[in-house]
């Protein structure tokens, strides 16, 4: 039986392979379909499936539990270069999908992410990825212009730079950040946090 906060769920007992003699009658021709019944269509955990950025939630939670905060930050930044910003304004879809909520309450995923992201604001524990430079051609000589210094444009420039390109971001406002700076009120998202993360992207 599986205990949940609403009681318990009883599953039918299954015979163990060691208890029966294996034969053709035990073989299912549609075993592939039957095997997938308990899996999500995406083949990933519910929290990662619910996350719009598809961050490996279970991965960085495990790393954080082991005290490997920089490695957890590295894992988050594979999909999201603004961990501190998202730690403050994320609507926590991962927590809504967390299966731990069927037992007692969902894991405080956003609080863990926010704590990990704070490490990025500290110069000593900051994670700045190394450039992946092709061995044959070296760095790319092509110039790339990114129009707009909002979260999408800055993310684009970040991942291009990581691949060995040298992008230039063009922004008409006095400072980059887009809606992070101009659309979200300061009581919801501190502007110094946005500026700090943009400075990290410049590195």
Regions found by a protein language model. Name each.
Residues 1-140, 191:
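Ferredoxin-type iron-sulfur electron-transfer modules and their immediate structural context
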Residues 23, 54-65, 73-75, 102, ...:
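Beta1-alpha1 glycine-rich phosphate/pyrophosphate-binding loop at the start
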